[in-house]
Curated annotation (Swiss-Prot):
Gene3D superfamilies noted in UniProt: Eukaryotic translation initiation factor 3 like domains (1.10.246.60)
Feature: compositional bias, Basic and acidic residues: 71-89
Transmembrane stretches, start-end: none
Location (main, coarse): cytoplasm
GO BP annotations listed: formation of cytoplasmic translation initiation complex
Acidic residues compositional bias, start-end: 1-10, 23-38
Descriptive protein name: Eukaryotic translation initiation factor 3 subunit J
Function: Component of the eukaryotic translation initiation factor 3 (eIF-3) complex, which is involved in protein synthesis of a specialized repertoire of mRNAs and, together with other initiation factors, stimulates binding of mRNA and methionyl-tRNAi to the 40S ribosome. The eIF-3 complex specifically targets and initiates translation of a subset of mRNAs involved in cell proliferation.
Keyword Hydrolase: no
Amino acid sequence: MASWDDEDFEVPAAATPAVPANWDDDEEEDVMDSWDAEEPTKAPGPKTTVAAPKKAQRQQIAKIEREMAAMKLKPEDASTKRDRQRQAELDSDMMNASELFGGTGGIADSAAKAEAAPAPAAPAAPMKLSDLAIFHPKEKKDFTNLKETLAPILTDLNKTSPLAYPDFAITFTKALAEPLKVEQLRKLISTLNAYQNEKIREEKAARGKKKKPGLAAASAKINDDKDTSTFNDNFDDFDDFM
């Protein structure tokens, strides 16, 4: 027999059973050993681009056209038509303003700027005549200037309203004379009386010019005859003197 030492004999090692990491039979996902593990990167999504102002304007124009087309399909009253036209004009003005100022937000941006803008100041009150310096005379030359300015304006009213002007002149003169004293009123009356006499002479002269030419010629002939006889008498007196 051969010796046991002559052959190498290896004793098989007993397999050690694997000890489960968990005592439960359910399988679980392995926990990451480190919290610093890198997260998977996400693919970049598509970038959003801001629509150009012209695109918003085209959309607004298309909207207006659709509204106008829809309004044509049904009858509308005058008030609705005016409101629609006014709104269309307003939208058109807003679009023109947007193109002019180059707003990035199109019509909406222009509208927002218009709302944010301060309200315009109220119009100034109209000037009164009493605010003019000419109606505040202080010296005699100032009153003369006022008279020369107002008189032509007021007297021209007689040309357009000859029936109403006399009453106006009387009441206006009375209103102007109200602050005057008695002596000043007498002077005013005397001035008016003198002016009245002047007017009477002018009217008589005007009536005399309207007489018939035949009567005027006959009157002139009579005067000529009278002058001739007088001349003869004077001539006889001259003979007596000689």
